[in-house]
Amino acid sequence: MGKNVVVLGTQWGDEGKGKIVDLLTQDAQVVVRYQGGHNAGHTLKINGVKTVLRLIPSGMLRPNVTCYIANGVVLSPQALLSEIKELEGNGVNVRERLRISLACPLILPYHIALDKARETHMGKSAIGTTGRGIGPAYEDKVARRALRVGDLFHRDRFANKLTELLDYHNFVLTQYFKQPAVDLESLLDESLQWVEELRPMVCDVSACLHEHRKQGENILFEGAQGVYLDIDHGTYPYVTSSNTCVGSVINGAGFGPRYIDYVLGITKAYTTRVGGGPFPTELLDDVGKRIAERGQEFGAVTGRPRRCGWFDAVLLKRSIELNSISGLCVTKLDVLDGLEVLRIAVAYKDRDGNILSRPPLAADDFNDLLPVYEELPGWQESTADVTLMSDLPANARAYLKRIEEILGIPIDMLSTGPERDSTITLRGPFL
């Protein structure tokens, strides 16, 4: 009997999911993306070669893995075809192993135009989106007016829906945001190319996944972003437009909850965040700069610098509860090498001195909170590329053990560098 494993980020994304998914695909026959879009970049480094995947599941770099983009993903045909051609240029056979749900909502040029226009209009109050049309595409989905992949293969239906939808969005673009309209005819012409390229790859993804399950194959579900970017459970409104928690597997891939065997939560040994929004443990001093430099903390898609801070156990506890996380994978432990003192946030304190053990539910409610830290000694030895727990410095092992004690959950994997082999596996999710 096969196992079904979910890998998701427990913080604000950028936790290193791509490398871990790629590593775990040695035991998987199927890898599935189930939410988000091409706003999330998963960075892989294999034999010194760096690859950034945005839409295509990380399992694509394993020759025997079938990859699915499920219905919970908002899909930009332009971005997908560009990514396919980039991988094919590097010798990866994509089209024979990639399948796309007919029910994926499409990201079209007017979504991108709206996204950028809104961010510009909001000025200093901007959310800090990637400007790739993700939010507006999900808005169309929820408003029940989205064009989906399946519509592309019915020309008259697609043209009629697009004409009506573009009238609406162009009105907003031109009249409210004072931006140029998106041209209907050029978009219709471009969509003809998408039809021919996508046709061999589309299917009913949910039905295919259940066939794989019945055949006893191992299935890996690859999450994008992180728990605190979830539209419902994140630091609203500084969130993404999709559900990033484990429940999104059920809706976003059509896969029943009782079939999930293991949930692996990915967390950095510290905390990072891109864009605006609350960040209780953020470091604005030389330590924060040092972590950012050593960790090369720049967004894989946007190149924007990431904000860096201490490990926040308050946030992690809630992530574990929300997602029934089975075990953790701690990444970038080596970035902390050489620090004299490490801190873990174990609670928050409000302006009246009250101690809070859980994070608030709205971004504004973080404003007056300060982290309550527990200090631990750092280590001077290198942890880079260590592959055995016993070879880690004593203080590094103590740091990890304390995280386990605070969170009440095991650390099953550790990443000590960007390469596949720079990993310590204590308990494999598929075992």
UniProtKB/Swiss-Prot annotation:
Q: In which pathway does it act?
A: Purine metabolism; AMP biosynthesis via de novo pathway; AMP from IMP: step 1/2
Subcellular compartments: Cytoplasm
Q: Tell me where it mainly resides.
A: cytoplasm
Cofactor binding remark = Binds 1 Mg(2+) ion per subunit.
Where does this protein hold IMP? Answer: 14-17, 39-42, 130, 144, 225, 240, 304
Can you tell me which residues bind substrate?
Answer: 300-306
Supply the EC number(s): 6.3.4.4
Q: Which CDD domains match?
A: AdSS (cd03108)
Alphabetical UniProt keywords: Cytoplasm, GTP-binding, Ligase, Magnesium, Metal-binding, Nucleotide-binding, Purine biosynthesis
Q: Which GO terms describe its molecular function?
A: adenylosuccinate synthase activity; GTP binding; magnesium ion binding
Tell me what reaction this enzyme catalyses: IMP + L-aspartate + GTP = N(6)-(1,2-dicarboxyethyl)-AMP + GDP + phosphate + 2 H(+)
* Catalytic residues in the record: 14 (proton acceptor), 42 (proton donor)
Residues the record lists as binding GTP:
13-19, 41-43, 306, 332-334, 415-417
One GO cellular component assignment for this chain's record is: cytoplasm
Q: Which cofactor does it need?
A: Mg(2+)
User: In UniProt terms, what function does this protein have?
Assistant: Plays an important role in the de novo pathway of purine nucleotide biosynthesis. Catalyzes the first committed step in the biosynthesis of AMP from IMP.
Assembly description:
Homodimer.
> Which family would the database say this protein is a member of?
Belongs to the adenylosuccinate synthetase family.
Q: What is this protein's name?
A: Adenylosuccinate synthetase
Q: Which organism is it from?
A: Legionella pneumophila (strain Corby)
Q: Which gene encodes it?
A: purA
